Each structure stands twice: as structure tokens, then as C-alpha cells.
């Protein structure tokens, strides 16, 4: 069946209709789109009926065409269904978009559209009329009046059209100005928005950078603090381990006692010479380490506050004494050692360097003590109205506390306390003396240095720090004995030999007993006699004469079976008393 041809009215309607074309791919004439509704409200069927209304067709032809259409239409069996909600919403939104004010046009008449052409033609007519007027200036008056009237009418019409055109142009200019101003406002708003967003991004980036720098600084500070604490703990452990050496040194006898022992032979003075050389080398190492640390600590400060190490150390560095062989050389060597020239030189260097570092040391102590001290506690104490807050030793600077402790006879009293040997051990007395520590408890000795008070304070501080660290890690409270053993043993614990796989009955636990001595269990295989023979033996032992025994044996032999003949023959062969063969 050929497709239906559209009329001129339907084609014109498609040009004036802004709605999209509804295309049905399953329609018989799918290659030609069908247009549903036009802008004027008429449909395709109405236009065709209007245009082809004069054509008359027979009823039979219509029926045949309908049957052919049903056969050719693949959707003939479909039921009529209303438009879905989705299509309605789509059409509604589309109509809303089309009805937007931006797409509205301006109504105008055909005269306004052709006003420009009419004005151009009218201007040419005016020129022609002027030329005619110049040619016919001597014409009749009636013609001039008619021409004047006609010109007036033309001028009125042209002026009215020109006013309408100007008004329309003014409206267009106003609309253009409004659109331009709105575009400018939108552009400025977008620019301000972009600028604000860029400013926010830059601000957030700067804040993130500052936070990152602060976080890195805090992390570095924490690492340095941890490193300092670890160094301090190692130094404290070294001091604790050196306490045993100091205790043994305090037990050395008086110089008058071991002078005779040292000068007796060269073999006795040789260890003293080696020990003195090693001590002097250790002193040089510690002194160089101290000067190095002072240089590193003052690297970031002003050079005026730096203290230089003594360049001329007057002590005898080259203490290299050979082991003497003769008695006179031994006495001279011991006299040189007992003069303490090398030790005095070392002490002078240490004391002079310490006195030079005292201002710097006091300044550093006060600075870091002020940073460590809690300012909140001081502010709270001041707010409570406590006038004696500054008099407390805790709230004072370390230099002030040291000065107050050493004021008056404080220094002499502390020095005298260190010259008393105080120890609870049994061997706390000096070698070569018979008195115990209880007898010499209050006796001062210039050759003794016992800082038990300071050592106890250091040990207590270390134990508290270790216990706090273990409790923070979840280990709970730790006894002092365990911590002391860890300090003395270097933190290594003795591992017991325990089989961990033998728990919960996974291995059989048993103990091997020792072998029995002088014990023999009964062996039944070695006994050849039966119960009758044993019973007969005991009857023989209990009988008073051999006749009774023979009579009893004769009766027993008669009562035995024939199967026991061999046994009875063996018994008869026994001439005398025989026990167990």
C-alpha cells in the first residue's frame, strides 16, 4: 500500500510547529514521519479531509482499504493504551522549556516588516514628485492643491510608520541593554565567585602547609627529646655500674699500709703503673669529649659566650715509666707516683674549665628549668593569694637552689658527709684494718669518697622512670628488685630450661626410679618340688624318729597313683636329709 501524501496545509503546519516529530518505528509507513499536532490545533486527517473533501469513494473500496491496512499494520493486534506518565512528564518539561521567556518573539504586522521597503519607495516617489513639480510649476492651481493634499497624507502615514519603527527599535535596544547588563552581572558574579574559591583554596593550602610544617617540627622535637632521654639513661646506667668500682676503691688500705707492699718488689708496683697510665688516658678522653660537647652546644649561640679549652695543660702527659728491676728504682718510681703530679695537673685542668663554664651552665639550667616548669601551676598559686609561693624551693631556679644549699657551712658539711664510708655490706671496711663498718661509721677519712645519698637519688629516679614506662606499656607495676636485676644484668633474663610443648597433657610426664640393690624376687621356675613334697619335708622335720617317717612314707607311697612312680622312686633314693635338692 503506497504511503499517504501530505497536503500543502500539513507541510506548512510542520514549518510553523516547533514541537519535535513523533516518529513511530513500527508504523507501516515508518520511512515517512507522521505529524501529530500542529500549532493551529488541526491534525493531518482534518487537513486531508478538508483538501480531499470533494473526492467521493465507494463504501466497498473503503472496507477493502481498511482490511489491507489491518493486514499490513504489525500493531493491529495491540490494545489502545493511554500515554504513559513518563511521556507526559517529558512533554510537560519540554513545553515548559519552549514556553521560556527567552524564546518568546515580538508580535509585528506585515506593514512593519515591509516598512523599510515602503519608506525607500516613498522617498523615490518624493524625488520624482519634486521633479514633476519643478517641471509643472506653471501648471493649474487645482493640480497643485491635489498634489499638496496627497503629500500631506503620505507624510502622515510615513511619520506614523516611522514612529512605530523607532518605538520597536527602542524596545529592542532596551532588551539588548538588559541582556547585556545581565550578562555583565553574571560575568562579574562568576569572576567574584572564582576569585573567592581561589582565595579559599590558597588559604586552605597555606593552612595545610603550616600544619604540616608544625607537625614535622613537633615530630623532630619529640625525636630529639627521646634521644636525650636515652643518652641520659645510658649515662646513668654507666654511673650505677661504676658504683661497684668506687666501692672497691674505698676499701683500699691507707698509703702508709700499702707503701711497704708496693716497694717490696717490682712485680707489685707493675700493676700500679699500668693502672695509672690507663686512668690518665681515660681522663684525656673524657676531657676531649667534654670540650667537644661544649663546642656543639655553643655553635648556635654568640661567640662571646663560648669558652675555649685550656690550650696549655701543664700536667705531665708523657707518663711512661718502665717497670723497675732494682730496689732503688722501685722506690724512686713509687715516690714519683705518690707525688701526685699527674693527678694534680688533671684536677687543675678540670677545675679551671668548670669554673669558666659556670656562667654558661647556670644560664642553661635556668632556661630549661623555666621551660619545664608548669606556668599554669604558678598562675593558679598566684590566683589563690599565696604570698609565699616564691619562697618555695620548687618554684625557684636551679641556680638559686644550688646557692642556697651551698650557703654558709653547707659545702663543708656535704664534703664531710662524703668522707664517711657508709655501707651495709660485711666487707665495707678497709683492707688491712680489723674494725668493721659499725665502728668507723662516724669516722671521716680523706681517702674515701662515698656519695651514697646522690647515688640513691639517681637510682630511685631511674627506677621510677622505668616503672612508669612499663606501666604505660600495659605491663603493670614492676618491683624494684626486678629493675635492679635488669640494670645489673644488662636487661638480659635467664631463660629456664622448660619444655613448652609438654603442657596440657601433650607429653607424658614420668620419673625414672633408681635400681633396687640386694633384692631378689621369687623365681617359681627353679622350684622342682610339688606341694606334696614340701609338705612331706616339713613332716619329716617335725617327726621324732626315722621309723615314724618311714611308716608315713610307706603309707603315702601306697596312696600315690601309678603316674607318680618316678617321683616316689626319686624320693626313695634320698638316703639322708636334703633340702631343695
Curated annotation (Swiss-Prot):
The entry's keywords: Nucleus
Cysteines engaged in disulfide bonds, as pairs: none
Family membership noted in the UniProt record: Belongs to the AATF family.
Stored PANTHER family: AATF PROTEIN APOPTOSIS ANTAGONIZING TRANSCRIPTION FACTOR, PROTEIN AATF
Localization per Swiss-Prot or TrEMBL: Nucleus, Nucleolus
GO process annotations (BP): maturation of SSU-rRNA from tricistronic rRNA transcript (SSU-rRNA, 5.8S rRNA, LSU-rRNA)
Record's compositionally biased regions (Acidic residues): 51-71, 126-156, 171-180
Major localization listed first in the record, in broad terms: nucleus
Pfam families per the UniProt record, alphabetical: AATF-Che1, TRAUB
GO cellular-component term (any): nucleolus
Gene: BFR2
Compositional bias ranges of the Basic and acidic residues kind: 94-103
UniProt biased composition (Low complexity): 41-50, 181-196
Name by which UniProt lists this protein: Protein BFR2
Region (Disordered): 19-196, 486-505
InterPro entries in the cross-refs: AATF (IPR025160), AATF/Bfr2 (IPR039223), AATF_C (IPR012617)
